[in-house]
Amino acid sequence: MSDDAYGATIAKYRLARRLAELRRGTQHTANHVCDMLNWGRGKVGRFEANQWKRPEMSDIRDLLRIYDVGAAERDELEDLAVRARARPWWRDYADIFENEFPGFENDAVRIRVFMPLLLPGLLQTTDYFEAVMRHGSRPPAWRRRSLEARLRRQEILDRSDGSTPVLTAVITEASLMYRWGTKVDRREQVDHLVELSRRPNVELRIQRFADGPPVGMHSMVNIFDLPQGEQSLVYLETDYAIEEVSSTDSVNSYIQSFARASDSSLEPADTTAYLIQLAEQLE
């Protein structure tokens, strides 16, 4: 396991679902299991809802005993629990992240992101981020912590252990036209986008003014495709919160909307050419 705790969030997510399936297979209610183990009411429900930080191995073994799980499956689930117990870096940023967003982003095999007015966080330079934050109402200490977390998030694009996700980002021409910082700052941001667009795991697409209003999406959307066939998750961003969307119908709707937004945007090669031309204008 890499030092960014790759796989810990997915392991915890999968373990929660498997425990729920096992309990339902025994016909026990969650409260009945709590009573059998002398646990407080609600503990099993929290486990199954993935509302835990790190599963305790003794708790997992107690549940597997109650559910009469065979040796092979028990070993598999205990291995999941061990991986789920890894402490990821974002646990130190609970003041910045209120949910599992950074964990699923960290573990995703594919990330699709659409931002109508700003550049996605994974693509931002430090100067761009600081310029955006200066216009907000967050205190300086929070902004510094948020920048630290943003830089840690971006490290997933540089992993060399085979776990680097594929990133598809649809950005708008508007996000590139705002005046912020100095011309040098803006040039560095565009140069950074050019460099990213040339990576084999990054696909950038621009929605231009000339092509009409954005098609398909109008809010900040992140779609995380998870490993081993897990259902994709969607996170919606606002200035003050990141909301998870997990229902199958809603997730599928956002995936379809993203496809329309992507199809109405410049192809990746044309996007790179556009960005190079924009960088030249900022010389």
What is the meaning of each model-derived region?
Residues 2-7, 11-17, 21, 25, ...:
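Interdomain hinge/linker segments and adjacent boundary elements that couple functional modules
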Residues 42, 83, 216:
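Short Asp/Glu-rich motifs
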Residues 182-283:
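C-terminal regulatory/effector modules of DNA-binding transcriptional regulators
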